[in-house]
């Protein structure tokens, strides 16, 4: 099985640094980190994270971060973003405003 490295920086703090197995089906990269399932669409670059408690949908086309929790959906606007996809290396940087401005950077090497 193929492996990828997934890193998430939030406000320059490394929050996730994992090497996990993945597969691609219908141009969607599927992988799990702990109990969380991730789906990254290689065409639209949208990222969805789900577990038994909540879903986070980062939709760059709509410039929204959607969080679904206990039957409620919360929306946070993406202020700006950039996506670089070069030879099995994806770097996504985005900023959104919740209680404060949050800068995230996701790096996927596969």
Descriptions of predicted regions:
Residues 1-2, 42-44, 59-63, 86-91:
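A short, compositionally biased
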Residues 35, 53, 71, 98-100:
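Residue-level detection of beta-strand-connecting loop/turn positions
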Residues 89, 95-110:
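Mixed-charge, glycine-accented linear interaction segment located at domain edges/termini
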Residues 18-57:
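Short, well-structured hydrophobic secondary-structure segments
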Residues 29-31, 67, 100:
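Structured N-terminal alpha/beta-domain signature
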Residues 5-9, 30-34, 48-50, 92-97:
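Short beta-strand segments that buttress and anchor functional surface loops
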Residues 1-28:
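Long, hydrophobic N-terminal alpha-helical segment
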Residues 52-58, 64-84:
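Terminal, non-globular segments
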């Amino acid at each position: 099985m193929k492996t990828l490295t997934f890193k998430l920086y939030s406000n320059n703090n490394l929050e996730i640094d994992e090497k996990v197995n993945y597969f691609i089906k219908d141009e969607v990269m599927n992988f799990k980190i702990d109990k969380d399932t991730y789906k990254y669409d290689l065409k639209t670059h949208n990222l969805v994270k789900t577990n038994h408690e909540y879903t986070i949908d980062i939709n760059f086309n709509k410039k929204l971060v959607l969080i679904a929790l206990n039957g409620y959906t919360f929306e946070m606007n993406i202020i700006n973003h950039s996506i670089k996809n070069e030879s099995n290396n994806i770097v996504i940087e985005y900023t959104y405003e919740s209680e404060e401005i949050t800068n995230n950077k996701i790096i996927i090497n596969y």
